[in-house]
């Protein structure tokens, strides 16, 4: 098992320390242990979760929905975790549909059609 400090976790996930601390406050992450000095220690599962949360956030999933999912997973409440996973999946599908609609609109723009017509 790897052990990470906040700064190591942030570095490995490609985010700032401020993001990691914000996610800690929101309940998206939690340390597996604390040092005698009170510093959080994180494991590979925390790194994986941080990468997931960041990817979901960048894809347009709100931190509130992600926090509800993480709390359910941390509580080992299978029914609640399944319900929150369904909510996040629904948000992902809505985002996919919105992006597909946007892509169709972009394709119908005059500049896009002119570019396609100019291709050999």
UniProtKB/Swiss-Prot annotation:
UniProt xrefs under SMART domains: HTH_MERR
Q: What are this entry's molecular-function GO terms? A: DNA binding; DNA-binding transcription factor activity
A single GO BP term for this record reads: response to mercury ion
Q: Which residues bind DNA?
A: 6-25
Highest taxon in the source lineage: Bacteria
Q: Which Pfam families match?
A: MerR_1 (PF13411)
Keyword annotations from UniProtKB, A to Z: DNA-binding, Mercuric resistance, Plasmid, Transcription, Transcription regulation
User: Record's InterPro entries?
Assistant: DNA-bd_dom_put_sf, MerD, MerR-type_HTH_dom, MerR_fam
Give residue ranges for domain HTH merR-type: 3-72
Name-wise, this protein is HTH-type transcriptional regulator MerD
Q: Which organism is it from?
A: Shigella flexneri
Encoding gene (name): merD
